[in-house]
Every structure is written in structure tokens, then in C-alpha cells.
Amino acid sequence: MGVPTLTCHCRVCSSKDPRDNRMRPSVLLVHQGQTVVIDTTPDFRLQALRVGLERLDAILFTHAHADHILGFDDIRPFNLRQKAALPVYASEETLATLKHTFAYVFDEVPAISTIPQVTLHAIDGPFDVIGTRIIPVPARHGDMGVLGFRFGAAAYLTDFSSIPDTSKALLAGLDDLILDALRDAPHPMHQTVEQALELVRELQPRRAWFTHIAHELGHSETNARLIEAGFPQVALAYDGLHFEVRL
């Protein structure tokens, strides 16, 4: 839902630390002047403006929940500027939901105004985009199948509650692991902080960043707690975080 949460006046929602002000989670990959966005959140327009995004070459979707797809219509300026359709990569299930949710984009009714121009690509294994090998990493978001993505020595896994051993095998030798850690209390569709730490113990990335963070977790105090618990290599991600990835 983002932080601050509407109608909430808790300590984190009232925090003056800009790192406690969180839009919905998304990632921008930049390689050799080309860019890929993972998930077009409801905050996509503001996120793109914040980083000065002027070119978009592809979109990857982890799954089709509202907080990950509802910024889809805001890709139109990139179509107009680049005079090209954008490739979209997602699972068959996610593509089906996109077609249903944004029916005006995909039906055959003539559009009165501009609509997003895309080409759809169902993910069924590793693929290449902007000169980078993308490895899909299947996981479970409650009863729902979702995809994480590995690119070089980094991986991004948001919105998941469990991950099979076959997917864990795809995550060996990581420099950076970005993973779901919603809060301390159990949730049927997300990892807790302790579950995320257990996966960090198992996979042993050089660094780990927690994302999809609810308003129960304050940035500075949670990071201090992680250090005290013996995890100096783990921290909460924050809006605007950027780092280089070894491909």
C-alpha cells in the first residue's frame, strides 16, 4: 500500500526520515543506455519522473496484483517518444490478467485516444533483453505463482511466501539479493523478516536488501536491529537505492 499508509499516524507513517516514505516496489535496470522496468506500479509515473526516465526498452512483470500493474497505462509517453511498441515479458497467467484488466488496450475496438502499444511475450525460460540474460525464478505468493528474476549476480524476488528448492538453485553465487520481507508478524502471502533472514542464511549472498516493507518496520531502527542480530550485510531497501550489478 506504500508508506505512509492512508489514515495511519503510527511512528513510521509519521517519520521524518525520507527512507520511511515508500512507493510501491519496482526496479529499473540500466545497461548500455537501455532500460527495463520490473513492474509498473500505481506509482510508476512518479517513480519515472523521480529518476528522470526518458527511455524505456522493456517491461517485466512479477505477477498481476494491482500494486504491480496499475501504472501500465503510463507507458504511453515512451511509445510516443520512441515511436515503437514496448516488449512485455510475464507469465501466461499474468498476461491473461493484463489483457482482462486493460481490455481497452487489447480489444479490437478502435481507440479514441492513445493507448499503450506493447508486444506480449510469455516467459517459459531464460531470455535476453537489453543485452542481459534474464533468468526467471518461480516462487509462491500464497496460492499464486509469481516470478522473481535473476540478472547477472543479482536477483529480485518481491511478493512471495515460499520458494522451491529448484528456484533456490538458481540463486547461488549472488552479490545482491533483493527479497520480500513485509514485517515481523506472519502473513499468508509474504515473508516475515525472520523468514527472509533464514533464506539469506541459506543462499549466502554478499548483500541482501529487504523490500515490500510495511509500515511496521522503520528504516533506521530495523537496520540497527539487523546489525545487532549478526546480519551487517542485510538492510532495508529504500526509494532511490541504486547499485552496480556484475553481469
Q: Model features per residue range: what roles?
A:
Residues 136-137, 157-159, 179-180, 211:
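Thr-Gly-centered strand-to-loop micro-motif
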